[in-house]
Amino acid sequence: ASMLETNDELLEKKKSTDILLKEQEEKRARREKGIVMDAEDYRNLPVEVTSITVESCEDYKSEVLDFSRFKELIVLKIKPKCFNYPSVVKIEKLPKLKSIEIGENCFSSNSANSQLLVTDCPALDSLNIGNHSFSDFKTFSISNNAMLRSLTMGSFCFTEAEFTLKGLGGLETICLGEKCFEKSRHTLIEGAMCGMGVMVRLSCSV
């Protein structure tokens, strides 16, 4: 009987090991594709990924979220209801980044120092932010993204934020949803127009 029990235990251990190995392989394959399901995925993404899709990341508890290490990144997509905790979001010095898409109800920190910084991304073409994302952030600065053509936000984004636009010579359209920057105390638009017509639309739906 004891031998049978030992065999059963060995089989159980092997089964557990096989499951663990399978889970590790699935995580590795997922991360190689730039898919994020939790904070561990994000921390272990290969720096050479060209696309990042954040499906879920409620357990990310750092105040700073910095994408700047991903120098090969072309597409950044964050699905709804992600990243409730970070108060400083940096998307900076990414030479190949073309598209940023952030879903609804992301980034809900109301820290006094909360800020979104999108700077020095020379290939960036479009930035889209869904309803109620960054609602209580205090600063939104987007600068030195010469190829950016379209900036779109849903409703209730950055309701109290200082808004800075600088060095956006290619900008064609700014589309702001309801209540965006409604209580903003400071807005700076510098070098964004370059004599070209920029269409600004209010109360847009994303």
Question: What are the language-model segments listed below?
Answer:
Residues 54-59, 78-84, 102-108, 118, ...:
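Concave beta-strand-loop units of leucine-rich repeat
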Residues 10-11, 15-56:
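N-terminal capping/linker segments that flank leucine-rich repeat
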Residues 38-46, 63-69, 89-92, 116-118, ...:
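Leucine-rich repeat
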Residues 4-5, 174-177, 185-206:
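Leucine-rich solenoid repeat scaffolds
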Residues 72-77, 90, 96-99, 117, ...:
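Discrete beta-strand positions within long extracellular beta-solenoid architectures
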Residues 42-86, 94:
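LRR N-terminal entry segment and analogous cap-like coil->beta motifs
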Residues 47, 68-71, 84, 92-95, ...:
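Inter-repeat linker/turn residues at the boundaries of leucine-rich repeats
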